[in-house]
Every structure is written in C-alpha cells, then in structure tokens.
C-alpha cells in the first residue's frame, strides 16, 4: 500500500433540522393548539485513531466528507431524528491542523482516541416552543443552525522510540533488518528507502522498543533536496536518535565529512531537534582493518568534537548490535523512570517536543510555499528583494527616463 503521511480534507457537519409548524386537529377539539416538534441535531464529524492503519492514502483522492443533517420536526410534538455522526478512521500518530488558522486541533496518539473536528448544527424549534399566555396559536418556528465546516490538514508522524539518521547507504535499513523482524529493501545504490519503515526490537522476553528508518538525508536537504527532508518530521516524537555513519563508503568519501553534513542539515531543519538525545553509531566496521578502523573513529570524534555515546558496529554481520540494543533499552527505561519521578525533567522534555513540532511544521510549510510559488512561475519574497537591490544599484548607470502624460 502506498505510504501517504500528509493530506488536506474538507469536513462539514450536518445542519440542524428545521422546527415544525403544526396545530392539533381532532374531532370535537376546535382549538387544539400548537403541536409542532423541534428538528433533530445535525451529525458531527469525528476522527478516530485506528491501530490497523498506517497511511492516509484513503484521503488522497476522496477529500470531502459531510455528516448527515437532522430531520425536521413532526406534528404531535414529535422531534426530528438526529443526524448520524461521521467517524473517519486515521492512523495512530495523526496530528490534525486547521488549514485556515494553522492551529493544532489535536493529536491522536492512542488507539480508539476520538477527536471532534466539526460540531453538528443545533436543531430548530417548533411552534409549540413559542406558545404563551398571550399567544395561544403561534405561527413562529426557527430553522436549524448550519453545521460547522472546516478545511483540515492531517499529518501522520510514526510513533517510534528510536529514529535513525544518516546519509543514503549508511546502512540504516540493514541495521533495522539485523535487530528486528522488519524487512525493508536493501541495495547498493542511494535512496533505496523511499518511505519510513518501522521495526520492533525485542530485548529479553518482555521488553521491546520501536525503531523508525527514514530515507537518507543529503547535502541541501533543508532546502528541499532529496527525499529525507519530508520525513524528518517523523523523528519529532522519537525518544532517541541514532546517527549512523558509513565507515567505508563505496565512493571513498570522508566519514567525518558525512557526519558533519547530517548535523548541518539537522540544524537547519530544526535546531531543537539537535537537542534530542543522540548517539553516534559507526557502521560497516567489518570492511576495515583494526588500525584503519581506529584511525577513522578518531577522525570522526575529533571533527565533530563528540562527547556522547559512540558505538562501532557491523549491521550486516550483527557485530555490536546486541550490546547497542541492550543499552538503548536501558536508556528508555531510565528515561521513563525519570519522567515519572521528576516533574521538572518531564516538563523540559515536553517543552522540547513542542519546540521540535513547531519548528518542523514551520520549515515544511515554508518549503511548500516555495514549491507553490515555483509552480505558479513566481519568486519568493527574498528573491524579489534581491532583484530589487540589484536594480537599485544599476539605476545610476543607465539613462534617466521621464514619463510624460
């Protein structure tokens, strides 16, 4: 099934049913009085997290959804039937955003969680409601209120404990195959991974964590180059980042330079994301001699001025992967314990999560705006400003032109 992680839809709640104007008419009862009933409320629109879904592809081609309107009231004080609510299933991890205001309406992070996105219209009143001591035969009713309508943007972020970062062909997919039952495609050419992959890593009998593998980043990714920039948002909810570096690149490149490239692009995309706990993992160590391995390890650490945890592994040979997974599980357990026992630590992590979400959304929205301008044949404000500055410099060199009416 095609992986779609971002869609725009329109939702419309049902209108309320109109009130009824009716009078009681029975044999031997001349003036029965009003008996018009109220209309029914319109149906509302809900989004519900479904753990069996992993993509928003169902909303790629069908984008308009309307709930049922309420029925009008009946005679004999009968109330109209309420419109049926419309429940739209979405994957767990979906963020709902109002397209008009860019306000986050809610996050669906638990299976079965529901979110009201459009409230049904209020019912109209029948003429019975307007009966009084001075108006015994009212001919007044009210129509039902229109249901709420909204343009929504749905963003899916996969829910994973650990996220993998790295250039194409750094061995991220091989790593996830080595430590879990996931089988993403692996090949010796760049951009083999086109969509995020998830793998569940079992540590012992009762413990496990989820790893997310996204397409590799390249130089200029923060400006929209390559595939990985669109999927970096999936790392926003991870608890730990593993920065994989190829120690023996096929093109003979510099591993330290490759690591610096990832850090630069990460900083451009979201400075807050660089503050997430990040471990350095040097992969493909089996392709190097011991002396060369130590030399390249030292070069990477010196170039990055790295102070955090470092692991040298071979995902293909499963060398060093078990110890790495054990340490990851220990870190996640310790992190959960601190969140439960230290309110300040929990609040700091929550604030960091909010910063990452905001920066990722702002960056991706800017890229979308630039893409829309290019398609329309227009230029961004910065480009136009640069052109204006260039023209101002040239104004003094050319002939002075007077426009005469």
From Swiss-Prot:
Record GO cellular component, one term: cytoplasm
Annotated positions binding GTP: 166-173, 191-195, 213-216, 283-286, 314-316
Residues reported to bind Mg(2+): 173, 193
Principal location listed in the UniProt entry: cytoplasm
GO terms, molecular function: GTP binding; GTPase activity; magnesium ion binding
EC number: 3.6.5.-
Family as reported in the entry's similarity comment: Belongs to the TRAFAC class OBG-HflX-like GTPase superfamily. OBG GTPase family.
Protein name: GTPase Obg
Upper taxonomic lineage: Bacteria, Pseudomonadati, Pseudomonadota, Gammaproteobacteria, Pseudomonadales
Gene of this entry: obg
């Amino acid at each position: 099934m095609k992986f779609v992680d971002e869609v725009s839809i329109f939702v419309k709640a049902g209108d309320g049913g109109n009130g009824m104007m009716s009078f009681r008419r029975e044999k031997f009862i001349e003036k029965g009085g009003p008996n018009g009933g109220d209309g029914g409320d319109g149906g509302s629109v809900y989004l519900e997290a479904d753990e069996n879904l992993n993509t928003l592809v169902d909303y790629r081609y069908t984008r308009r959804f309307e709930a049922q309107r309420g029925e009008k009231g009946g005679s004999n004080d009968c109330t109209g039937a309420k419109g049926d609510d419309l429940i739209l299933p979405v994957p767990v991890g979906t963020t709902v955003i109002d397209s008009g205001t860019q306000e986050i309406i809610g996050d669906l992070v638990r299976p079965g969680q529901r979110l009201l996105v459009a409230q049904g219209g209020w019912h109209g009143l029948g003429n019975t409601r307007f009966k009084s001591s001075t108006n015994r035969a009212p001919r007044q009713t009210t129509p039902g209120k229109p249901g709420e309508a909204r343009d929504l943007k749905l963003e899916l972020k996969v829910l994973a404990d650990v996220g993998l970062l790295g250039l194409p062909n750094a061995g991220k997919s091989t790593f996830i195959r080595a430590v879990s039952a996931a089988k993403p495609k692996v090949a010796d050419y760049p951009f083999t991974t086109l969509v995020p992959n998830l793998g569940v890593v079992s540590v012992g009998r009762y413990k496990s964590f989820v790893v997310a593998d996204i397409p590799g980043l390249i130089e200029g990714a923060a400006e929209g180059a390559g595939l990985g920039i669109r999927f970096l948002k999936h790392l926003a909810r991870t608890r730990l980042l593993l920065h994989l570096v190829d120690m023996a690149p096929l093109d003979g490149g510099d591993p330290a330079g490759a690591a610096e490239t990832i850090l630069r692009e990460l900083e451009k995309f979201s400075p807050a994301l660089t503050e997430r706990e990040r471990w350095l993992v040097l992969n493909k160590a089996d392709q190097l001699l011991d002396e060369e391995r130590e030399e390249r390890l030292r070069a990477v650490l010196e170039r990055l001025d790295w102070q955090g945890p470092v692991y040298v592994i071979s995902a293909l040979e499963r060398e060093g992967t078990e110890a790495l997974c054990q340490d990851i599980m220990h870190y996640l357990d310790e992190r959960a314990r601190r969140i439960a026992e230290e309110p300040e630590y929990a609040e700091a992590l929550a604030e960091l999560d909010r910063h990452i979400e905001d920066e990722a959304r702002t960056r991706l929205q800017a890229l979308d705006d630039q893409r829309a301008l290019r398609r329309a044949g227009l230029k961004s404000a910065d480009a136009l400003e640069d052109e204006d500055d260039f023209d101002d410099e040239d104004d003094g060199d050319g002939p002075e032109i007077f426009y005469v009416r």
